[in-house]
């Protein structure tokens, strides 16, 4: 692979969230004003939908009742830039050194009124063909008490096994995701699986897999990809499978974006 398709999001004095094909991939704010993420596993053949939300709701905002929009006035300084870039492997992902395939900009002049959250979108094509990912064929699912209980059980089992230095259940649960990520980045699935296994075992050996408590109150399911995926989040809006900080303040987070088919959960992203 000579080039890497990435999403680059920058913001000044505001919060912003970027999505691709309905899946939120990057969020920035004053503390973290820039973010770059590879996006092969979320790109599709044909038209792709790029989304940018200014002042997004918290990730765990309840779907109902809907919160009212907030009236705001631009100060001429706040801005956000979203780019899809195609840099060469090893090169810096900057507009000056990479091909720009799509972009969204928000920079209202001083005094302009707007309502937040403010959503912008753009459709664009890609010069690369991607497979038809499984999540595109997943059924639309709803966050129900039964599904929430099932997700809680799965996450608790994964956390227990990983904390004991036993990654087999996690590797099996994420097999479909691992296979597609390997395909997306032209790697071998078995190599990707082994890399993940070694990483998890190394973290356990370092004593870094003490997970935050996984409780019903700490699990939230965020709908995305037009309802085809549910992301398992904790009370802070990050992945529910997140460790307690170690002595250096480092945490490990393992995102889980799942679907449900015939009563069984599958981790697809």
Model-derived regions, located:
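Accessory beta-strand-rich segments of carbohydrate-active enzymes
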Residues: 3-61
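Beta-strand-rich recognition domains
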Residues: 1-16, 53-269
């Amino acid at each position: 692979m000579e080039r890497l398709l990435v999403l680059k999001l920058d913001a000044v004095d505001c919060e912003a969230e970027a999505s691709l094909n309905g899946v939120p991939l990057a969020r920035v704010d004053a503390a973290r004003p820039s973010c770059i993420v590879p996006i092969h596993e979320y790109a599709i053949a044909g038209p792709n939908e790029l989304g940018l939300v200014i002042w997004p709701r918290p990730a765990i905002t309840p779907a109902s009742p809907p919160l009212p929009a907030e009236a705001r006035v631009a100060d001429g300084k706040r801005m956000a830039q979203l780019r899809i870039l195609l840099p060469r492997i090893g090169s810096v992902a900057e507009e000056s050194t990479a091909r720009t395939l799509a972009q969204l900009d928000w920079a209202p002049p001083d005094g302009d009124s707007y309502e937040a959250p403010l959503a912008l979108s753009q459709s664009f094509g890609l010069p690369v063909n991607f497979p038809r990912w499984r999540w595109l064929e997943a059924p639309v699912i709803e966050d129900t008490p039964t599904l929430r209980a099932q997700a809680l059980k799965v996450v608790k089992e994964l956390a227990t096994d990983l904390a004991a230095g036993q990654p087999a259940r996690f590797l099996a649960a994420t097999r479909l995701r691992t296979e597609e990520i390997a395909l997306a980045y032209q790697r071998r699935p078995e190599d990707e699986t082994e890399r993940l296994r070694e990483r998890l075992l190394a973290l356990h050996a370092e004593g870094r897999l003490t997970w935050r408590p996984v409780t019903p109150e700490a699990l939230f399911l965020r709908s995305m990809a037009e309802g085809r995926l549910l992301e398992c989040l904790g009370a802070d809006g990050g992945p529910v499978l997140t460790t307690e900080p170690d002595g250096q303040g480092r945490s490990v987070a393992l995102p889980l974006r799942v679907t449900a088919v015939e009563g069984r959960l599958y981790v697809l992203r």
